[in-house]
């Protein structure tokens, strides 16, 4: 009841560290980001026993609603290996997002002009062969102030990249096709 009025006003992030079934799954999937701990998090409206009873299909809870499956479904923003990694990702996201819709995004010190002038990687990024593939994530990493990009829904659409980073100290969002 308190969550929905805050939607769109302040960042809402859920961490899934165990099983969530039935109506309990509605709260996390209505937040802006859902971080799930691999091999621990599961969420489904109807569990495997009911599926087996109604349809005859024998499916495990991980196959039905495990973290990796929910990432493929688009319900989970990121799957991380541990609870500590989940909390680290929340901290990283909050470092990039404004506290409310009325606030500016946080700004950090930009790299010095000397650091930028010395970086020649962008000049050699594109392959000479127009049919050769390249990893767009490498380009986004080079465009950003540092090498720390926060990729969201990495496995939902592997041909697309959605990530947060910083350029000149300001938070930016990247949405890019990935030809690799």
Ranges and model annotations:
Residues 1-102:
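Conserved catalytic cores of soluble enzyme domains
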Residues 131-180:
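Non-catalytic terminal/interface segments that mediate subunit docking, oligomerization
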Residues 5-8, 115, 167:
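A generic structural signal for short, non-catalytic loop/turn and secondary-structure boundary residues
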Residues 1-2, 36, 42-45, 126-132, ...:
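Generic detector of short, locally flexible boundary/turn motifs and exposed helical patches
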Residues 17-19, 33, 61-62, 108, ...:
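Short secondary-structure boundary micro-motifs
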Residues 78, 82-140:
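Terminal amphipathic helices with adjacent charged low-complexity linkers/tails
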Residues 10-13, 23, 97-104, 129, ...:
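Short secondary-structure junctions and interdomain/linker hinges
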Residues 47-48, 67-74, 114-123, 173-176:
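Short acidic (Asp/Glu) and glycine-rich catalytic loops that position anionic groups and cofactors
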